[in-house]
């Protein structure tokens, strides 16, 4: 039905170029997921439009149908491809993509934000902001229990109240209850944001933090974008690739052996790394400023490819 609505609408017909971008969407974690996204590219070509996969994160592709959809649509209907990491390029190649694939960077790090006054302005303690989500809750319950229990134990280590703890759900509908449960079971005093925030407000909150601890990729990228030292909990190659390309020296590994290595989350390791970043906050912020400026240059590749397509 949605596809028919799109055909009847003028969105594609009135456009000159159709860009499909974002991270994690082009993967067959759901059987029909590649088809559900790429069908719009086919539709765009039927209307004679130029098409581009813009700074995407791709893979994994584990089903024959998923690989077929990617191979068929990209080889026949895509004009330009930029990907944000080597791993994404490799997944496309393994699926049989023959088109040129250009490695660039994640455009989120180029986000600018206007400084705004928030209720969080006046702080007397160092602020640690957590961006957490219930990863693997449905797909791997035992690994999810490790994640939940490890995070509860980790948060309990801040019971001395020396730090201000702030929990920032990125997808409120999915993440809020998980964050609330972590706070309630750990018994600590913490603030929990309970509204969907726009990117500008989110970046202001991250900028006013002393360290960001994030499970979500874009929690890490947005922290880097506003110059706040961060501790990524890496559960997917997309986050690992970003950290590697940025040149950041901190990460905590956690995974089930599919999208990332098979490793339980260690609360003591998480706490020790958080404390180290806080102790080195000023030096790390200066280093991060240099690293993010270099990484931002990768976004120029995306724009250069787009300009070439526009010609």
Which residue stretches match the model-derived regions?
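Active-site anion-handling motifs in enzyme catalytic cores
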Residues: 1-311
């Amino acid at each position: 039905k949605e596809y028919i609505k799109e055909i009847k609408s003028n969105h594609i017909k009135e456009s000159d170029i159709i860009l499909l971008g974002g991270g994690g969407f082009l993967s067959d974690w759901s059987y029909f997921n590649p088809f559900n996204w790429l069908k719009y590219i086919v539709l765009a070509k039927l209307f004679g439009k130029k098409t581009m996969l813009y700074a995407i994160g791709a893979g994994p592709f584990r089903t024959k149908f998923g690989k077929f959809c990617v191979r068929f649509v990209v080889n026949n209907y895509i004009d330009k491809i930029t990907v944000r990491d080597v791993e994404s390029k490799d997944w496309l190649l393994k699926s049989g993509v023959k088109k040129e694939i250009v490695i660039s960077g994640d455009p989120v790090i180029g986000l600018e934000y206007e400084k705004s006054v928030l209720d969080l302005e006046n702080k007397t303690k160092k602020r640690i902001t957590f961006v957490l989500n219930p990863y693997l809750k449905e797909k791997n319950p035992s690994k999810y229990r490790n994640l939940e229990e490890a995070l509860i134990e980790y948060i309990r280590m801040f019971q001395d109240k020396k730090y201000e703890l702030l929990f920032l759900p990125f997808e409120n509908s999915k993440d809020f209850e998980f964050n609330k449960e972590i706070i309630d079971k750990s018994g600590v005093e913490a603030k929990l944001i309970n509204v969907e925030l726009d990117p500008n407000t989110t970046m202001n909150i991250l900028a006013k933090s002393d360290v960001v601890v994030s499970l979500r990729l874009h929690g890490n990228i947005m922290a880097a974008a506003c110059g706040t030292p961060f501790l990524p909990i890496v559960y997917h190659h997309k986050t690992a690739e970003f950290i590697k390309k940025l040149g950041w020296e901190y990460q905590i590994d956690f995974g089930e052996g599919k999208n990332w290595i098979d490793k339980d989350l260690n609360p003591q390791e998480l706490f020790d790394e958080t404390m180290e970043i806080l102790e080195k906050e000023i030096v790390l912020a200066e280093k991060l400023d240099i690293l993010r400026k270099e990484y931002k240059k990768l976004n120029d590749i995306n724009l250069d490819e787009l300009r070439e397509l526009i010609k």
